[in-house]
Amino acid sequence: GRGYDPEFLTALGETEESLSAQIAEENVQALCNLLIIEFPTDEIRGEAAGLLEELYAKADYTVGAAVPPGNGSEVEITVRPVDALARVNDALWERLDAFNAGYTGDTSTDEGYAAYDAAWAEDALALFREKLAEAEYLSETVCTVTVLDGPGGTIEAGRDSLDTVYGVLFPIWMLQET
């Protein structure tokens, strides 16, 4: 588990398991949004969750020793980013254009559009699978995370610094100047 603060869980009225499940579902939805899948079925969500697990398994990082700077500790995390999401983003629109050019189904009804979206979802997930297999590691980056003592002997890290580590591990795309 993530080691959530018990007071935080109580305030939310959640258990660690239910909160972790919600976060996992939000990550699946974020992947579906990235892949432009509008109406993911349970099957598509399950496949997306499995692909995210594969992506997370590629995470490569080393956590250094804590250095006490006063009211807490700073921990350096050396991260080797994986470029899978950037590769997906780079290929997505071309893949969608090719899919649309070859799609012959009727999208004028709700049922027809749902069939289109399901077919696109399979193609988009296949693209993700392809790019995940091709993914390479980028140059190492060092991130510093401030860790504080939490209640009950737990430790806490600021959400912003953890988001920075996550963003470095899995860069989605670089904004291009126009």
Describe the residue ranges of each PLM region:
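Short beta-strand edge/turn micro-motifs at domain boundaries
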Residues: 97-107, 111, 115, 133-178
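Beta-strand elements of well-folded, non-transmembrane domains
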Residues: 79-85, 149-151
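A short hydrophobic beta-strand element
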Residues: 71-81
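Core segments of small alpha/beta cavity-forming domains
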Residues: 1-58
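Mixed-charge, low-complexity intrinsically disordered segments
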Residues: 20-23, 27-35, 85-139
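Residue-level signal for tight coil/turn positions that link beta-strands
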Residues: 68-72, 151
